[in-house]
């Protein structure tokens, strides 16, 4: 009888076959083990919550990326588009009496109704950490250092983390005293490195001389220690000076720890969400036009859940990490056994003995001969153990 069930998947989702599933699980465990070694404890939040949870701190345009639905009581729910807001809600409710700082880690599927990108579809996997209650330079340094180690543990060798400071951008824009629509346009252009859009804004709002130069530097400053020096020379007497000094202290601490070779300064990094308040960062690898890692400080977010508290963290996109590595784990059960024969009770007993030693075992009670079982074992990359005559 013909089936009327759909055989195709909706746009933006995909199945994971054994090689991809094995690679993702191995990567996930390596990252969770890395987080644990730094004292971060794993938490889990629901796949869906009230939509208002995810609207906290999110730009107006991001609300359209939510997968929303209505429950039987008429309340609007949504699939989680990221993990920071749910963990902020969890801390403000279930963990608010715990001693700070809290170090929390996670690995979870998230959902965004966006155009699919390289290594990120509408359903994708994130792993990350949140450091709750640690304000200032020490917390920023810890999180960035952990991000570097996480990327190394993920199997990447040629990666770089770009460091920015959204408060520098806010300070520069504050000094310019532009209308809100101009500020929004500048933020969007800086985030996308759209120099043409910036040129239009310069012309429209008659930004010239030193005012224009400061915006141009925000968009173009890029590099190491010399980039910081250039930024200090330009912004040292503006509202951005204190934030820039904080970024310099973070850079110096990370450099003293031997991490400078993985870092660069990019004041155009603003991240996707409005709740970032201080130092932000993104991780890149050659040949992949999207970040594999991103995060930063969001000191105002927990206050929206009734628990004012400084916080910082980051997330890694697992599919993007696998794409950057360009490889998958073997899906075979290499080193395992095919236990074959006609005596099913004997097969089960022997399989249990082997599994107790940590060996993967496939049962075969259908092969009619040792030769047939040997062919099946070879096709699966397994060792053969024949029981019987």
From Swiss-Prot:
Q: Which UniProt keywords apply?
A: Amino-acid biosynthesis, Cytoplasm, Histidine biosynthesis
Return the Pfam families for the record.
tRNA-synt_His (PF13393)
Which compartments is it annotated to reside in?
Cytoplasm
Keyword Amino-acid biosynthesis set for record: yes
GO molecular function terms noted in the UniProt entry? catalytic activity, acting on a protein; histidine-tRNA ligase activity; transferase activity
What pathway is this protein a component of? Amino-acid biosynthesis; L-histidine biosynthesis; L-histidine from 5-phospho-alpha-D-ribose 1-diphosphate: step 1/9
Q: Which GO terms describe its biological process?
A: histidyl-tRNA aminoacylation; L-histidine biosynthetic process
Q: Which residues form a coiled coil?
A: none
> What are the annotated GO cellular component locations?
cytoplasm
Which ranges does the record mark as transmembrane?
Answer: none
- Where does this chain mainly localize? cytoplasm
What is stated as this protein's family in its record?
A: Belongs to the class-II aminoacyl-tRNA synthetase family. HisZ subfamily.
Q: What exactly does this protein do?
A: Required for the first step of histidine biosynthesis. May allow the feedback regulation of ATP phosphoribosyltransferase activity by histidine.
Q: Any extra detail in the entry?
A: This function is generally fulfilled by the C-terminal part of HisG, which is missing in some bacteria such as this one.
On assembly, the entry states:
Heteromultimer composed of HisG and HisZ subunits.
What this protein is called in its record is ATP phosphoribosyltransferase regulatory subunit
Give the source species: Moorella thermoacetica (strain ATCC 39073 / JCM 9320)
What's the source species' lineage? Bacteria, Bacillati, Bacillota, Clostridia, Moorellales
